[in-house]
Regions:
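Active-site loop/oxyanion-hole signature of alpha/beta-hydrolase fold enzymes
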Residues: 46-49, 53, 88-129
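Catalytic active-site module of serine/aspartate enzymes centered on a nucleophile-bearing elbow/loop
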Residues: 279-315
Length: 315
């Protein structure tokens, strides 16, 4: 009986901390852009105006798992906006974008939402730049809607099953047990470990100064966002098993960048296989770099965008 009382007290206290903490996080990190309604759910977008004299294609930046558009803004937004119109989106369920409860976790679902968002914004045949899970989304979009894409720059994208070794664990967290954890203990513990976790993602490069604050990384600790993230990662292995069979049909210019020390998405298990299967893919493996190439090797990513822009204009 005493044990039960302790458990209830801990969970109850965690629930109160989570409720208050989520509100404080949202108060500290306000939306950067505007909202577009897609099927009754608001999608948060930020637009950066490019050089009006340039004929460069627009660029759409897609963030990875457990993140939000602030990460891509911090790494590439202003840099690419010098030459391109840049659009950043919070993927459904992340940042300040909403999604229907229990739905929208697969890259195919999110590609449909992205198509609607870009259509509303009048973004014509952009270059999609996606990091990690966002790279998978960009790849799916190009396979499903090739006529709507000028090209791809994929940064450490999961392309085949076996993602991070975490898909089964995240699928478990998407169950009612995960719901209870997300609404009670995940935020208090996550607030302690989010900086060390971010540091691990950047290895072997150092974590940029004030990264957690400047990227609004704490937004992922809100219960709904945690559940969305667990569902997204949990479904990825099964989704990629089917999508991998389509890579030979990829029809747009594509550059893939990966670090040879990326432990989250190792090149041999993912990008190397994609490049072997898809004739339009150019693979660049950077020695000594890890998973967060868009920060650690931003110049190389920007160069890849310009190369894809040139290739797309020549076709």
């Amino acid at each position: 009986m005493t044990t039960l009382i302790i458990i209830v007290a801990v969970l109850g206290g965690g629930a109160v901390i989570t409720l208050i903490g989520a509100r404080l996080i949202e108060r500290a990190h306000q939306p950067r852009g505007r909202f577009i309604d897609v099927g009754g759910f608001r999608q948060h977008v930020v637009e950066l105006a490019g050089n009006p004299q340039a004929a460069s294609p627009p660029v759409v930046l897609l963030h990875g798992a457990g993140s939000n558009l602030g990460d891509m803004y911090l790494a590439l937004g202003e840099r690419l906006a010098a030459r391109h119109r840049v659009v950043l989106v919070d993927r459904p369920g992340f940042g300040f974008s909403a999604r229907k409860k229990g739905e929208g976790s697969s890259p195919a679902d999110q590609a449909v939402v992205l198509r609607e968002v870009l259509g509303r914004l009048g973004v014509d045949r952009p270059i999609l730049v996606g990091h990690s899970w966002g790279g998978t989304l960009a790849l799916t979009f190009a396979l499903d809607f090739p006529q709507l894409v000028a090209g791809l720059v994929l940064i450490a994208p999961p392309t085949h099953p076996g993602v991070w070794g975490l898909s089964r664990f995240n699928a478990f967290l998407a169950t009612p047990v995960g719901w209870l954890f997300a609404h009670t203990l995940a935020l208090p513990f996550g607030a302690i470990f989010i900086a060390p976790g971010s540091r691990t993602a950047f290895l072997p490069q150092p974590l940029p100064q004030h990264y957690v604050k400047r990227s609004a990384a704490m937004l992922v600790l809100r219960p709904a966002t945690l559940l969305a993230n667990w569902a997204d990662v949990g479904c990825l292995d099964a989704f990629l098993a089917g999508q991998a069979e389509r890579y030979g049909t990829l029809a747009v210019p594509t550059i893939v960048l990966n670090g040879d020390r990326d432990r989250l998405v190792p090149p041999p298990q993912h990008c190397t296989k994609l490049a072997a299967a898809a004739p339009n893919v150019k693979l660049i493996v950077l020695p000594g770099f890890g998973h967060m190439l868009h920060h650690a090797a931003a110049d190389r990513v920007a160069d890849a965008v310009e190369e894809v822009a040139a290739l797309s204009s020549a076709t």
